[in-house]
């Protein structure tokens, strides 16, 4: 058994315990504009803002601007709290010389809020991929294949950490080993995509994870 060379992390619900906050934000938005489709707040998890607008608010630039302003204000006041044990886990990866990157559907503007709250955030990762880097949104595998390509390794030499259904589908399509975070979906749902499921990073050993794949 050998270590995986690269660990790729989604952001919300994987690095930060923020996914429930976004669910409430988008639930309020869709209650206003799609009152008969309550499932949409969950269905969009893992998608870029551009994709959401193209899919649900196409040709409505004024409404898009209004939602963007609300989202920016929401994120400006958001507290980005790490998922339990994450900081110790990322240090563990560095000690094992495992390359690390964020693969998020969030945009660069939001990431500035992250960097302001956590000045050491960039030091945890070798690279941060954002929505602007992706030609296609999750569940397409593009973003995770890009992550593997950036480090010059095969997808099977990576391990991806995800929490959303669109994220699970993206990783699976990239033929990449998947660790599911049980922060956003019930275990029985995550089980459809991976049997490697963790509630957080407390007492998680990377070598043990690698031994499973």
Where do the model's predicted regions map?
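Short phosphate-binding/catalytic loops that engage adenosine nucleotides
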Residues: 96-98, 176
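Asp-based, Mg2+/Mn2+-dependent phosphohydrolase catalytic module
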Residues: 1-5, 91, 107-109, 113-213
């Amino acid at each position: 058994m050998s270590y995986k060379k690269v660990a790729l992390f989604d952001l919300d619900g994987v690095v930060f315990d923020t996914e429930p906050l976004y669910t409430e934000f988008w639930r309020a938005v869709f209650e206003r504009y799609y009152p008969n489709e309550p499932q949409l707040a969950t269905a969009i998890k893992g998608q870029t803002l551009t994709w959401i607008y193209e899919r649900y608010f196409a040709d409505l630039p004024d409404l898009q601007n209004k939602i963007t302003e609300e989202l920016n204000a929401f994120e400006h006041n958001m507290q980005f709290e790490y998922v339990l044990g994450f900081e110790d886990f990322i240090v563990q990866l560095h000690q094992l010389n495992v390359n690390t990157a964020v693969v998020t559907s969030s945009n660069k503007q939001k990431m500035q809020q992250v960097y302001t709250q956590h000045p050491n955030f960039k030091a945890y990762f070798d690279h941060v991929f954002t929505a602007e880097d992706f030609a296609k949104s999750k569940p397409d595998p593009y973003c995770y294949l890009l992550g593997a390509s950036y480090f010059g390794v095969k997808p099977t030499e990576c391990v991806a950490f995800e929490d959303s259904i669109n994220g699970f589908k993206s990783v699976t399509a990239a033929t990449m080993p998947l660790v599911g975070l049980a922060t956003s979906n019930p275990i029985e749902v995550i089980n459809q995509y991976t049997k490697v499921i963790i509630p957080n990073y407390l007492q998680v050993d990377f070598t043990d994870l690698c031994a499973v794949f």
